[in-house]
Amino acid sequence: MNTSPLPVGVVQLNSELLALESNLSAHADWIRTAQSESLELLLFPELSLTGYQLGRRTPEAAMRADDERLKSLARIAPNMTVVVGFVEQVSPGEYYNAVAYLKQGEIAAVYRKINLPTYGGLEEGKWYHPGEELVQVECKPNWTASTLICADLWNPALVHCAMLRRPELLLAPVNSASAIVSDEFSNENNWQTNVSFYAMLYGVPVLMANRYGAEGDAWFWGGSRILGPRGEILAQAEDRECLISAELDLNSIAAARFDHPAIRDANTPLIQRLLNQS
């Protein structure tokens, strides 16, 4: 088996609301920077091309999955897998909060956010259609990645289903703002608990990409990080726009999953029967 390591990166940036051309230019610059560092996988935050609080202006930000602007980003670094956040239009008036996997100069896959939060200061269920399928993409031989977008990771069943497919990586693009759920719910502390728990539980490296900066009254606190398969922090962003990177190793993943075989011992048939009884 080819057990060559995978150099990965996470971009922490502050997208400008509805400024697609400016955001595309910023993405291109970060992709070139990552390419110069010989990274093979690069993750941007949720809705990185559009900004977050789109509301009734969501249609202005939308593009189809085969949009030439996405393809132009893919062509910058054809030997790198790049994951960017965008609003996908699938039919007139129907939109998804989505990410595109850019690979070999093409759009290799699109994942659509399933769990749309509509509580606190979050209103995604008003503007987007929920996705219905999980997606797994091969970044290079023996390295596959699954993506769950932000609130997807607050539905444990979605994480479990994604991990039953045994990806080597879990990608977590988010748009997390301070106190947007409530004053008592600390996004900063709770996201740290969330991603480190899943990394440790499933023996999976987690790449978390959050924004940093203001959008209207919202403050996106950053905290982007790369976690190893035991929940350890391999790289963490400072309080600014930046690129962080780490090198991941298949042997470390195998050792973590051998020590704690959560996926091997999942007993999916029993869980399915119990779900059918509930």
Where are these regions (language model features)?
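A conserved C-terminal secondary-structure "cap"
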Residues: I253-S278
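Cys-nucleophile CN-hydrolase/nitrilase-fold catalytic domain and related Cys-dependent amidase chemistry
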Residues: L20, D29-V110, S176-F197, L201-V204
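Short beta-strand scaffold segments in enzyme catalytic cores
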Residues: V84-F86, N97-Y101, V135-V137, S224-I226, ...
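Short Pro/Gly-enriched beta-strand edge/turn motifs at strand-loop
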Residues: V82-F86, K113-L122, V206-N210
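RNA-binding accessory domains that recognize and position tRNA/RNA substrates
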Residues: T3, V10, S25, Q35, ...
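CN hydrolase (nitrilase-like) catalytic-core segments centered on the catalytic cysteine
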Residues: A65-V83, W154-I244
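N-terminal glycine-/serine-/threonine-rich phosphate-binding loop
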Residues: M1-L41
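Active-site catalytic loop in hydrolytic enzyme cores
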Residues: A65-E68, V90-V174, A179, D183-T193, ...
